[in-house]
Amino acid sequence: MTAMRTYQVIISYAVLSELEAMAQYIASIYRPESGHKYVNRILGQLAALSYSADAYQYSRFKMAKSIHPKAETLTIINRKWTVVFHIDGDFVIVDRIFPSKTIF
């Protein structure tokens, strides 16, 4: 049995900016804790890519391929969000996060 490969997850500035905007928007509607709780849930799922990234295949979405030629996609939070990432050596680089309805 081979050992499971693990990666270091790197989140791009674009994703961090999108998550911050998401937290602020949710906080403006509900409470500040709600925005941070939702973003922390997303960050937890992104962190799981450290051991699950190999389970995904290259994306068939043109939008994902335009971000990186070897892009892979993952849907999270009840399929509401699509994460575009790629593997580079020992790293999983999270490139973007989109509402799932907008990716094509």
List the model feature ranges, each with a label:
Residues 47-76:
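A short, surface-exposed loop/turn module that caps and links secondary-structure elements
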Residues 2, 74-104:
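Enriched for short, Lys/Arg-rich terminal
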Residues 18, 33, 56, 83, ...:
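A broad, structure-centric signal for solvent-exposed, well-ordered loop/edge residues
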Residues 26-28, 39, 43, 66, ...:
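General N-terminal targeting signals
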Residues 22, 52, 97-98:
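Residue-level signal for well-ordered alpha-helical positions
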Residues 1-45:
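Arg/Lys-rich, positively charged N-terminal/basic patches that mediate binding to nucleic acids
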